[in-house]
């Protein structure tokens, strides 16, 4: 027990090395730009002031978003998703996978669970001993289940998920702007030092190296930022991009796609004034998520992904799943309610549900 605890402590200590490295590079870049470039190299005072004001604006936003990404604790599933004591004992005693799934299905009927494993089973974490909410995954590094997990990032030593994904995207954006601003403003002095138009001073090394480092980081961050912008536009996580979520009717990589504008608001919120600020404004609670509409066949309980129209008295309406009293795991009860609704209006009714995961 003691050796494993010691190893765990060493791993936690070593996991901060990338964060320390990034902070050392940022501290050096701050010194090189403010002191060696602006104070010792740039002769014009007005140019110094303009460079410093804009630089500190980017630096502040970059550090703010970086700190929020690091410090935001990943949200974990609530006790509601843990098995009750009686069911847990039955589950642990049962050796047959089919019987274990029956136990999980009974518990999952009361939970907003709409995604499954590749084999159609309830997603259960044996490590955390809970039923995984939709889009929730277990992080082997943090040893916890994380809501809407995207990935574990060593550069922030934290899991990127529902609680801090917006901060992570902003961190990439502002770090990219920070690098491109430094490279653009340093370029003319880089050329002057390189061509010996300026005398050799202690600032020469800092200015030359600062340009190379800023350009290198900009190029590497640009590809990662572009990829995550694409993910935001598709309303996918990195995990979902590699492994499509499985709904009742099978895998669907576009299961959570709502349209470009709505996809963006899922991450950044519906108030644009907060989009550029590392302030939490993402929509939802991390447990349930709106998805494309699905049709429930009243007669057979079949579910099909498509654009749904619910026609009652000639009117077309769409009803979100959160407003429905039926879970996808409770087909019998849902079919009864839907059938009664069809009888009352004296015509076929297509019940519309918005799948949440």
Curated annotation (Swiss-Prot):
Topological domains on the Lumenal side lie at 36-50, 188-204
Enumerate the Gene Ontology biological process terms: protein palmitoylation; protein targeting to membrane; synaptic vesicle maturation
- What keywords sit in the KW lines? Acyltransferase, Cell membrane, Cytoplasm, Endoplasmic reticulum, Golgi apparatus, Lipoprotein, Membrane, Metal-binding, Palmitate, Phosphoprotein, Transferase, Transmembrane, Transmembrane helix, Zinc
The record lists the catalysed reaction(s) as: L-cysteinyl-[protein] + hexadecanoyl-CoA = S-hexadecanoyl-L-cysteinyl-[protein] + CoA; L-cysteinyl-[protein] + tetradecanoyl-CoA = S-tetradecanoyl-L-cysteinyl-[protein] + CoA; L-cysteinyl-[protein] + octadecanoyl-CoA = S-octadecanoyl-L-cysteinyl-[protein] + CoA
Offer one Pfam family short name for this entry. DHHC
Recorded superkingdom: Eukaryota
Q: Which InterPro entries match?
A: Palmitoyltrfase_DHHC, PFA4/ZDH16/20/ERF2-like
* Gene Ontology MF annotations: metal ion binding; protein-cysteine S-myristoyltransferase activity; protein-cysteine S-palmitoyltransferase activity; protein-cysteine S-stearoyltransferase activity
Q: Where are the transmembrane segments?
A: 15-35, 51-71, 167-187, 205-228
> Which residues are the active-site ones?
153
The residue spans the entry assigns to the Cytoplasmic side of the membrane are as follows 1-14, 72-166, 229-357
Q: Which residues form the DHHC domain?
A: 123-173
Membrane disposition: Multi-pass membrane protein
| Recorded GO CC terms | endoplasmic reticulum; endoplasmic reticulum membrane; endoplasmic reticulum-Golgi intermediate compartment membrane; Golgi apparatus; Golgi membrane; perinuclear region of cytoplasm; plasma membrane
What are its E.C. numbers? 2.3.1.225, 2.3.1.-
Enzyme class, spelled out: transferase
The record's subcellular locations are: Golgi apparatus membrane; Cell membrane; Cytoplasm, Perinuclear region; Endoplasmic reticulum membrane
Q: What is known of its domains?
A: The DHHC domain is required for palmitoyltransferase activity.
User: Which family is annotated?
Assistant: Belongs to the DHHC palmitoyltransferase family.
Q: What's its job?
A: Palmitoyltransferase that could catalyze the addition of palmitate onto various protein substrates. Catalyzes palmitoylation of Cys residues on protein substrates and has a preference for acyl-CoA with C16 fatty acid chains but may also utilize acyl-CoA with C14 and C18 fatty acid chains.
Report the protein name in the record: Palmitoyltransferase ZDHHC20-A
Record organism:
Danio rerio (Zebrafish)
Q: What lineage, starting at the top, does this entry show?
A: Eukaryota, Metazoa, Chordata, Craniata, Vertebrata
